[in-house]
A protein has these predicted regions:
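Hydrophobic ligand-binding cavity/cleft-lining segments
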Residues: 1-44, 97, 143, 151-159
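Glycine-rich portal/gate segments that line the openings of hydrophobic small-molecule binding cavities
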Residues: 38-80, 132, 136-139, 144, ...
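Intrinsic-disorder/low-complexity, polar/charged segments enriched in Ser/Thr/Lys/Arg/Asp/Glu/Gln
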Residues: 3-7, 46-48, 61-63, 73, ...
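Hydrophobic/aromatic beta-strand elements that line small-molecule binding cavities or substrate pockets
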Residues: 6-8, 37-39, 62-67, 87-94, ...
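Hydrophobic pocket/interface hotspot
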Residues: 17-21, 27, 49, 101-103, ...
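Beta-strand/loop substructures that line and gate deep hydrophobic ligand-binding cavities in soluble
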Residues: 78-128
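A short, structured loop/turn motif at beta-sheet edges
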Residues: 14, 41-45, 67-71, 91-100
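A conserved amphipathic terminal alpha-helix motif
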Residues: 109, 113-154, 158
């Protein structure tokens, strides 16, 4: 049951980061291991998406229901695929130097083989994923001012 929570202050507005995370269709363009994305349905408040993740010899697709609470929260709930469960949440709060991002992911694969494989690289994979979103923000919105940096902050506890 890999779980990861982290909080960072980043030099972008909550709306900007929300828009990047909510744009699931573009994940294959920048997110490591995301090799496909298809939006099944979308409204202003919710979307249903199929994502295909590939790492090493493994390739798995899954369906998620994504709740959009612009500009403060993106919640991902697993619907169908190789997981027993998957919960992912991004919270965006205004901060004097930009935005405080609170990120949480918790999941378990049905397959013990997949669970063991991801367990070995889980922390590195999550770090790369979060950094990919930060790089995407720089690519889309430009570099932050030289006086501002990404600052880790303590993540809040999740149930």
């Amino acid at each position: 049951m890999p779980t990861h929570a982290e909080k960072r202050v980043v030099p972008y507005r909550p709306e900007q980061l929300f828009d990047l995370v909510a744009d699931v269709a573009k994940y294959p363009q920048f997110l490591p291991w995301c090799v496909g994305a298809r939006i099944r349905s979308q409204t202003e408040k919710e979307l249903i998406a199929d994502l295909t993740i590939g790492f090493g010899p493994f390739r798995e697709s899954f369906t998620s229901r994504v709740t959009l609470e612009r500009p403060h929260r993106v919640k991902v709930r697993y619907e169908k695929g190789p997981f027993r469960y998957l919960n992912n949440e991004w919270d965006f709060e205004p901060h004097p130097t930009g935005c405080c991002v609170d990120f949480f992911v918790d999941f378990e694969f049905r397959s013990r083989i997949l669970q063991r494989a991801i367990g070995v690289v889980f922390n590195e994979a999550v770090r790369r994923m979060v950094n990919a979103f930060l790089k995407r923000a720089r690519d889309v919105y430009g570099p932050p001012p030289a006086t501002v940096s990404v600052v880790p902050a303590p993540a809040r506890a999740r149930p």
